Amino acid sequence: MLILISPAKTLDYQSPLTTTRYTLPELLDNAQQLIHEARKLTPPQISSLMRISDKLAGINAARFHDWQPDFTPENARQAILAFKGDVYTGLQAETFSEDDFDFAQQHLRMLSGLYGVLRPLDLMQPYRLEMGIRLENARGKDLYQFWGDIITNKLNEALAAQGDNVVINLASDEYFKSVKPKKLNAEIIKPVFLDEKNGKFKIISFYAKKARGLMSRFIIENRLTKPEQLTGFNSEGYFFDEASSSNGELVFKRYEQR
């Protein structure tokens, strides 16, 4: 079983590390090509392209400039500990045991605009390059054209290595669009998280993102390997709703706190 999650815009390079082990990203040659393109952008161009403030654009221009092809624990940190968004609040990788990291390294992948696919312990230098950004490059007009089949092929390698054919899609639509489902040697299961608001169940972005992290943690902590085991997920009040679910979609609901 291979879990897919999105990266985060918020990064943490200050907190103490809970493991000293690390691996290197497997698609660094591709990342270096994107850095080459990104370095051509001025801060105002970055601000316009990414729809971010001038201050953030300056920070990210500096990140592109400072990026080096040689990754060390001094200039990078493990991806699963560097990302700090809603998904990662639910995941709480900073509390993982070494055995948890081992299982995650085999069964969890983070999709990335710059790095393509990251394993949890892959070192990552700070960056911001969302998958949906229209960064022109030698392979096309955006990052989807740049990555082509590369991400899908890398995921197929991971599935083959564990002798499995199930992908748990906990990534956002923006990131999962970088995967070619028809070329993926796997059944795709998508958990959906609905929260009650004013008597109706719907996707509330903040809660849904955190729930994707909670589900990832549930799979890792319990060493789950079969999709039917996911129906036991009950973190923070969620419950499985079989009637609303279908073959490829598992629906989890949570009642409004009253």
Swiss-Prot record:
GO terms for biological process: response to hydroperoxide. One of its GO terms (cellular component) is cytosol. Signal peptide: none annotated. InterPro entries: YaaA (IPR005583). NCBIfam families: PRK02101.1-1, PRK02101.1-3. Belongs to the UPF0246 family. This is UPF0246 protein YaaA. It comes from Escherichia coli O127:H6 (strain E2348/69 / EPEC). The lineage of its organism: Bacteria, Pseudomonadati, Pseudomonadota, Gammaproteobacteria, Enterobacterales.
